Amino acid sequence: RAKELERRVLLSQYLLAIQSAGSVPPQETGLTYNSWFGKFHLEMIWWHQAWQPLWGHSELLSHTLEWYKTVEPIAREVARRQGFDGIRWMKMTDPSGVEAPSSVGSFLIWQQPHFIYLAELLYRSNPDKKVIEKYNYLVQETAKFMYAFATYDELGVRFILKGAIPAQETLNASTTINPPFELSYWYFAMQIAQIWRERAGEKRNLEWDELIDKLSPLAYNEDGLYLAAENAIDTYKDIRFTSDHMAVLGAVGILPMNKLIREDYMKNTLQWIWDNWNWGKTWGWDYPMTAMNATRLGEPEKAVEALLMNKRTNTYLPNGHNYQDPRLRVYLPGNGGLLTAIALMCAGWDGCEIENPGFPKNGKWNVMWEGLSPMP
């Protein structure tokens, strides 16, 4: 298993340095051939490039993030047209920043906090005032939209997220309330935006603090399993809810554990997904997402197994490309997710005291690495 992991890790670094470090965000097939009409997807930039500052290559990510500045007026107009403050980052777009029409993409929101997360990774790799000066304006404007998008539920005395299609795209925008990954991401990114205000010498936004304090906890069922959304009460009975991305695992994995989540319920959820998920309907980045969740929950054997699970969409060809199907023989978000997961499994995260937390402690693994940084 170690030899195959090394092969995938080495080849992925080359493939991503060539194809996921340009002046604009990469499309999912990089420069090899066109996918989705040559458009790129902003919810994928985290998967393509979050690994770069964690592996000591911040300059690659900062090069791409310059593009966000050029399309800020377009993103601001998207938010204004929809009645929101701040800027709303597009889902599917091109170098010009024009939003591509879509009955799904226009309702996605998980691309929104990515800019805050990626800017924070750049700051952590180089905690210099110049980084704050360079990115803080867009961090704050991104957070303004996030606050405006959340709805205050006076009856429940809480903030909710609705009117969106989650990362698990099998759910409806019109009925979905409080998808778990997006809730956790809102909690994380709004906190980071406040920290950036303090780093810039500004006061915390009290309204944002109220959102952070009153954001809804993740919804669960009577078996202690987290739901695909608060309204998705049939999550574990309807195959629509157990196909596509198991985004609930991203709530802890991509993101750190937080007060919205019970660790025991998340462990229950991981085990159920492990045993029962419709793995034939997954994508390449679902496996590193599962590995990161398992790592943070203290399940290193599952972390390794997730990265090497014998499924079609977790296939890595001799050239290192993450094969999905005959249409998508190249899928770089899978490669990027692999490198991010390996960074977490080796270097851990803030407050982690376990050496190489993503690898089993059975005496069979001798893990050596250098130059990796912990995740938040």
Spans of features found by a protein language model:
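Short, solvent-exposed loop/turn and secondary-structure capping segments
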Residues: 18-28, 51, 62-64, 149-152
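Extended, hydrophobic/aromatic-rich amphipathic alpha-helical segments that build helical scaffolds
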Residues: 6-18, 112-120, 137, 141-146
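Acidic/polar, glycine-enriched structural segments that form the non-catalytic walls/loops
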Residues: 1-39, 58, 68-76
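Acidic/histidine-rich catalytic neighborhood
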Residues: 141, 145-196
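Surface beta-strand/loop "capping" patches
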Residues: 356-376
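Aromatic- and acidic-residue-enriched carbohydrate-binding clefts of CAZyme catalytic domains
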Residues: 90-101, 168-175
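Active-site core of glycosidic bond-cleaving carbohydrate-active enzymes
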Residues: 38-77, 93-98, 104-125, 129-137, ...
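Primarily short, surface-exposed interaction patches in extracytoplasmic proteins
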Residues: 2, 24-37, 71-72, 121-129, ...
